[in-house]
Amino acid sequence: AEGWSLALKYSNLYYLIGEKGFIDEYHSAGIWLSLAVFMIVLYYIGRKKLKISAEFILLLGGFVGLLAPFFLPQMHERYSFFAEVFLILYVILKPQKFYLPVFQSLTSFMGYSIFVAQDWSLPIQYMPFITLTVLCLTGYEVYKYINDPGNQEVASC
């Protein structure tokens, strides 16, 4: 369809594979891919008995907030606010992870620059790599938290 796109200024997966072609096919496949990724993440987290802390809630909120717009089609740049807020709050607890919200905010800023300045500061094809890097680093932090023996609940008899 004329004027339709799989990516609406959010630097996600569809800028890597092409946001203009196969819109109907990729749209449906993207929704199913997103569902599969979420189910895998939920299964992995759900099979562990974890101590729920503020750190984990903020970290998981940031991870889910990055995961959804990266894999779902037709995401606007404003959908990253959720992740940015959680990552900024996470940095209050873990200041050494300051780079997570900084780089995520950079990609959002680039998405807005097309409207404000009518120009991309960096070609959009490079931006998903920054978003993917932040997503992977945040996912790794979730993985470390889940597998830390200090965060496991002890089973009682």
Predicted regions and their residues:
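Transmembrane helical bundles and short interhelical boundary loops of multi-pass, membrane-embedded
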Residues: 1-6, 10, 61, 94-157
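Membrane-interface catalytic loops of GT-C/OST-like multi-pass glycosylation enzymes that act
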Residues: 72-83, 116-124
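Membrane-embedded alpha-helical segments of multi-pass membrane proteins
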Residues: 32-36, 79-87, 127-134
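Aromatic/glycine/proline-enriched transmembrane-helix motif characteristic
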Residues: 2-70, 146
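Membrane-interface helix-boundary signature
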Residues: 23-30, 51-58, 77, 94-97, ...
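Hydrophobic, membrane-inserted alpha-helices
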Residues: 37-41, 61-68, 81-88, 107-112
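Juxtamembrane/interfacial segments around transmembrane helices
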Residues: 16-24, 83, 88-93, 105-117
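Hydrophobic alpha-helical transmembrane segments
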Residues: 43-49, 66-73, 88-93, 112-116
